[in-house]
Amino acid sequence: MSQTHRILLLNGPNLNMLGAREPKHYGSISLESIEEKIQTLATQHNVKVECFQANSEGKLINKIHESFQQVDFILINPAAYTHTSVALRDALLAVSIPFVEIHLSNVHKREPFRHHSYFSDVAEGVICGLGAKGYEFAFLFAMDYLAKK
């Protein structure tokens, strides 16, 4: 890669509680540990990753808007906003940055209201049910995607 690519790792509401919150669904690894692993991968691949987590929709939207023409790829776990946020979807579409949707748990094995996503049909891909490893797979997909650009 001739240029240093920039990736934004976005995490939505309640993901700051990973490791303590419902480990049956989300595992026992903290968000900080996931971010550290992604930063290690970023160093190995000579890319820059910014990690951002917010419990409010507006802060996530603002971060997406700030990424316009600044970021090459977004990795996003919208958490509960997956099923409710047209505004986050519209923000992602507005900036035209390719993204992968990530979920720690298999949302299709859970409550029916979790089966619908406002992001899946506009994402480059969706990874769910693979726990923290899903973030690594999403990162590696982003590397492959950016290498082909």
Swiss-Prot record:
Class in the EC hierarchy, top level: lyase
Listed InterPro entries: DHquinase_II, DHquinase_II_CS, DHquinase_II_sf
Residue numbers binding substrate: N77, H83, D90, L104, S105, R114
Domain of life: Bacteria
Stored SUPFAM superfamilies: Type II 3-dehydroquinate dehydratase (SSF52304)
Assigned EC number: 4.2.1.10
Active site: Y26, H103
Quaternary structure note: Homododecamer.
Record GO terms (molecular function): 3-dehydroquinate dehydratase activity
Family, as annotated: Belongs to the type-II 3-dehydroquinase family.
Protein name per Swiss-Prot or TrEMBL: 3-dehydroquinate dehydratase
NCBIfam families in alphabetical order: aroQ, PRK05395.1-1, PRK05395.1-2, PRK05395.1-3, PRK05395.1-4
Task of the protein: Catalyzes a trans-dehydration via an enolate intermediate.
Taxonomic source organism: Haemophilus influenzae (strain ATCC 51907 / DSM 11121 / KW20 / Rd)
PANTHER family attached to this UniProt entry: CATABOLIC 3-DEHYDROQUINASE
GO terms, biological process: amino acid biosynthetic process; aromatic amino acid family biosynthetic process; chorismate biosynthetic process; quinate catabolic process
Protein keywords: Amino-acid biosynthesis, Aromatic amino acid biosynthesis, Lyase
Pfam families referenced in this protein's UniProt entry, alphabetically: DHquinase_II
Pathway: Metabolic intermediate biosynthesis; chorismate biosynthesis; chorismate from D-erythrose 4-phosphate and phosphoenolpyruvate: step 3/7
CDD domains: DHQase_II (cd00466)
Site annotation Transition state stabilizer: residues: R21
HAMAP family in the cross-refs: AroQ (MF_00169)
Reaction equation(s) it catalyzes: 3-dehydroquinate = 3-dehydroshikimate + H2O
